[in-house]
């Protein structure tokens, strides 16, 4: 019992770092082209893109999509080199093209200190580090507007390239049922409590040993004390491989950028309702 309580208090300490993530702007606002990426500022007044551009890009930047997308979002020069212009914007029946001179820098989640993933299995998380990967999609999900913008990347001749943007209403997205659930889960405290299993498994660091993990259980009565601060309004997803609309499990990953934070929430679909059954920190 003492070890379980110690683990629970440790989770509070780990998750409390999430509380300052809420941005001052409305989450559905696009990042302005002139916005500064905090992690890249070295000298006041200098353009962070120019600072990054001065650093030589390793050939290894294309080996893992996980590495590439961060460089793509932070380096203006690299981004312009890795877009197939004119870039197709596919909105179903309507198709348009963006010319090179009209493109605005897309920073994705770099204005935050975290990004998110939605997967069916733990194995799909590891695909970001699969050197054999040849296609990936970054999804910009506007929960309030029920709208998804997809950025399609393909690795061509060893180089990752943005080849297309697709706009779709949320119901057309393979994750639509879960996204509708998540939107209510993070905005309605009563619904959130009703969406908890009677016992929520957790896995976290052992307070007595930095090299070990320990397991325990959180009951709904303790959830308010331990729940992480989850993003609302705008979230991102990186899709590697196939999405399965009929999957009865979804893992929502909240991963810090350069701060070591990682929280995984595992939901299971039971009798037509999503329930949180596990949290890993």
Protein language model features and the residues they cover:
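Short, aromatic-enriched amphipathic alpha-helices that serve as compact interaction elements
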Residues: 59-77, 175-191
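Short beta-strand edge/turn micro-motifs at domain boundaries
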Residues: 143-173, 260-281
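Surface-exposed, charged secondary-structure patches
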Residues: 87-92, 96-145, 206, 212-261
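Coil residues (strongly favoring Ser/Thr
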Residues: 34, 39-40, 50, 63, ...
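Surface-exposed beta-loop interaction hotspot
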Residues: 157-194, 199-214
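Sec-dependent bacterial lipoprotein signal peptides
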Residues: 1-16
């Amino acid at each position: 019992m003492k070890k379980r309580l110690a683990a629970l208090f440790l989770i509070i300490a780990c998750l409390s770092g999430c509380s300052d993530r809420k941005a001052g702007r409305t989450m559905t606002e696009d990042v302005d082209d002139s916005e500064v990426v905090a992690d890249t500022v070295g000298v006041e007044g200098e353009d962070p893109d120019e600072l990054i551009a001065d650093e030589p890009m390793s050939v290894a930047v294309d080996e893992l999509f996980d590495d590439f997308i961060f460089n793509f979002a932070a380096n203006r020069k690299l981004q312009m080199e890795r877009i197939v212009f004119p870039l197709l914007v596919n909105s179903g029946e309507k198709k348009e093209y963006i010319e090179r001179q009209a493109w605005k820098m897309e920073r994705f989640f770099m204005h935050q200190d975290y990004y998110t993933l939605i997967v069916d299995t733990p194995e799909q998380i590891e695909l970001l580090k699969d050197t054999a990967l040849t296609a990936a999609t970054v999804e910009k999900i506007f929960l309030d507007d029920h709208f998804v913008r997809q950025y399609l990347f393909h690795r061509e001749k060893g180089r990752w390239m943005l080849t297309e943007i697709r706009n779709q209403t949320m119901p057309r997205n393979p994750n639509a049922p879960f996204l509708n659930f998540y939107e209510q889960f993070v905005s309605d405290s009563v619904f959130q409590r009703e969406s908890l299993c009677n016992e929520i498994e957790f896995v976290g660091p052992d307070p007595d040993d930095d090299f070990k993990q320990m397991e325990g259980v959180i009951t709904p009565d303790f959830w308010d004390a331990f729940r992480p601060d989850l993003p609302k309004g705008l979230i991102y997803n990186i899709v590697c491989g196939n999405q399965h609309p009929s999957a009865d499990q979804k893992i929502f990953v909240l991963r810090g950028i350069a701060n070591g934070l990682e929280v995984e929430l595992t939901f299971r679909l039971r009798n037509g309702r999503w329930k949180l059954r596990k949290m890993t920190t």
